Amino acid sequence: MLIIPAIDLKDGACVRLRQGRMEDSTVFSDDPVSMAAKWVEGGCRRLHLVDLNGAFEGQPVNGEVVTAIAKRYPTLPIQIGGGIRSLETIEHYVKAGVSYVIIGTKAVKDPAFVAEACRAFPGKIIVGLDAKDGFVATDGWAEISTVQVIDLAKQFEADGVSSIVYTDIAKDGMMQGCNVPFTAALAAATKIPVIASGGIHNLGDIKSLLDAKVPGIIGAITGRAIYEGTLDVAEAQAFCDSYQG
């Protein structure tokens, strides 16, 4: 399982939100490229970038920062989400050297777009499913739909989606532990690999994901925990690599 540091971008800075609320953000660095360097030097094997402004505006806003990080680390797998609603935007990021593009709101509102994107950019598409109480949220988490996460995930199995990033909104940024039971249920219910996100606080949460014994959970995204020092990227990755269960 991969430990994937998150860099959330708001107005060009690296921030963390609590439960997806733009008004409840903590700025951790005004130099996201240097922050990326910190996690790379700490041994991370993939980075998770989010254009928060883009998620709310429906188009890329912090694209220059994303491009700068991708250029600095051309061999590092990078995934980007936030405001990706067109094939043109996906093409822009892929050409910039981004490995994976995360489709969130657009995947919920227009599932056929995911199939189209997978055909155009095979192996590059991740679906981001953000949920509250099992129901999918959209538009920067401002809207809660009537769509069940597991039902929607199954719809994408035939499209060739690389993975699903599953975020539990109630947990995100709160460092109170991730929703292991639902993450495991989602990974067990779909053929698509799942990356867990939201609420990871320490090594115990990483162990809980591994203890679920679901092969489909291939990664864990961590944000506030690594910024506030309750989780060490290198230590967590080493723990995953040596985990025997």
From Swiss-Prot:
Its EC number is 5.3.1.16. Keywords: Amino-acid biosynthesis, Cytoplasm, Histidine biosynthesis, Isomerase. CDD domains: HisA. Its main location: cytoplasm. GO terms for biological process: L-histidine biosynthetic process; L-tryptophan biosynthetic process. Pathway: Amino-acid biosynthesis; L-histidine biosynthesis; L-histidine from 5-phospho-alpha-D-ribose 1-diphosphate: step 4/9. One of its GO terms (cellular component) is cytoplasm. The active site is at 8 (proton acceptor), 130 (proton donor). It catalyses: 1-(5-phospho-beta-D-ribosyl)-5-[(5-phospho-beta-D-ribosylamino)methylideneamino]imidazole-4-carboxamide = 5-[(5-phospho-1-deoxy-D-ribulos-1-ylimino)methylamino]-1-(5-phospho-beta-D-ribosyl)imidazole-4-carboxamide. It is an enzyme of class 5 (isomerase). Belongs to the HisA/HisF family. This is 1-(5-phosphoribosyl)-5-[(5-phosphoribosylamino)methylideneamino] imidazole-4-carboxamide isomerase. It comes from Pseudomonas fluorescens (strain Pf0-1).
